[in-house]
């Protein structure tokens, strides 16, 4: 029996599935089984990989969505540990070896995750959690009136906004990290469920959990076609202490190798963006009892999420849903922006017209900010030049 069961759901990923499987085969830790659940593909995905590796278990089912496919794979898993990979993503070679070294060193822990890189093709790439804790979540916390992400006194490490402790990688993993392109990493630990109110802190791709954790948390919620990993990871964090390695363990690709955008059916962007954001809102409401919470912070974060859902609906030209969610959002701290968008949708002759107006207003806003930054910069340059000129003239008069 293999030590690690790797779960890979797939649907019409003929262009990426081989690269995903190859990234598992390149792991420096060899004791794994790979369970690929074909969720009713029609493009020959299953035929392409059948029989390609004796450690590969290929399962078939009628299309039930990614969460149904993950659940089938988890129920089939035989390993002591369960790891996840999407069929359009890849693991870095050290992922399983470093994860297993961690669990040997800390046998009482039940789940581990790491940083993952989002590759946006021509737009570049980002390290998700680092970007979230430096650029995205702190402004959101400020708007919600939350102090939960404040750094401890004298600390500048953004990961400490969430994790209570940090330590260097010990003897258990130092040599493994030294063989990676990154050369150094730290281990962060703590109870972080309450911090999940701001959004994802982890991704499934670099996450490994024990069978004990799987049995405690259960399966993925099939009510949500996209994004159920948010509530699953939050439940893990509510039940267990979180462990996080601050070095990339996996890469999430939004583009195929030929530069074309991947099929959007399983992504949180493009045509499925509204569904993704709506489902995240509903999961947030369930996890934090937002509909009846007396907590002002939870209420404010709920309004922020409603605004995001309303914008996503507007981008897709869905007038009814845009009015619904923007109408709910305009009751909170997001009110000025939500109210303006709500009135825009109300007065526009059609959803398409509202979408065009919204898109143009967004472009104008971005352009205005760029112009303002440029004007501010030139004003600073002019003030500096004027100060130097005045100083020079004063010195000349003195002589």
What are these model-predicted stretches?
Residues 4-16, 20, 27, 37:
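A conserved hydrophobic helix/loop-capping motif in glycosyltransferases and polysaccharide synthases
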Residues 82:
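Short aromatic/hydrophobic "clamp" motif used to bind/position activated sugar donors
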């Amino acid at each position: 029996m293999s030590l690690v069961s790797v779960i890979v759901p797939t649907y019409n990923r003929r262009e990426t599935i081989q690269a995903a499987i190859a990234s598992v085969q390149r792991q420096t830790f060899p004791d794994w089984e790979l369970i690929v659940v074909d969720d009713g593909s029609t493009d020959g995905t299953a035929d392409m990989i059948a029989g390609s590796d004796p450690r590969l278990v290929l399962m078939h089912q009628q299309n039930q969505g990614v969460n149904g496919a993950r659940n089938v794979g988890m129920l089939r898993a035989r390993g002591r540990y369960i790891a996840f990979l999407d069929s359009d993503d890849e693991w870095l070679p050290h992922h399983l070896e470093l994860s297993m070294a961690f669990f040997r060193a800390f046998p009482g822990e039940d789940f581990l995750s790491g940083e993952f890189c989002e590759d946006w093709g021509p737009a570049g790439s980002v390290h998700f959690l680092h970007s979230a804790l430096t650029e995205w979540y702190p402004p959101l916390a400020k708007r919600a009136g939350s102090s939960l992400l404040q750094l401890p006194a004298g600390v500048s490490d953004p990961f400490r906004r969430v994790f209570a402790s940090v330590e260097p990688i010990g003897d258990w993993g130092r040599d493994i990290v030294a063989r990676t392109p990154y050369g150094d990493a730290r281990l962060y630990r703590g109870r972080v469920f309450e911090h999940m109110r701001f959004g994802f802190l982890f991704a499934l791709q670099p996450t490994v959990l024990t069978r004990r954790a799987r049995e405690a948390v259960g399966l993925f919620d099939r009510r949500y076609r996209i994004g159920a990993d948010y509530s699953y990871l939050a439940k893990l964090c509510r039940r267990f202490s979180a462990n996080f390695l601050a070095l990339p363990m996996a890469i999430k690709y939004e583009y195929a190798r030929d530069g074309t955008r991947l099929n959007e059916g399983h992504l949180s962007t493009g045509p499925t963006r509204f569904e993704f954001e709506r489902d995240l809102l509903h999961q947030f409401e369930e996890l934090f009892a937002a509909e009846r919470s007396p907590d002002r912070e939870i209420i404010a974060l709920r309004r922020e999420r409603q605004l995001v859902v309303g914008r996503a609906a507007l981008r897709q030209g869905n007038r009814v849903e845009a009015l619904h969610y923007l109408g709910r959002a305009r009751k909170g701290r997001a009110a000025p922006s939500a109210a303006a968008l709500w009135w825009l949708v109300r007065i526009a002759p059609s959803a398409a017209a509202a979408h065009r107006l919204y898109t143009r207003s967004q472009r104008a806003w971005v352009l205005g900010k760029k112009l303002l930054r440029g004007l501010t910069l030139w004003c600073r340059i002019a003030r500096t030049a004027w100060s130097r000129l005045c100083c020079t003239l004063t010195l000349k008069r003195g002589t």
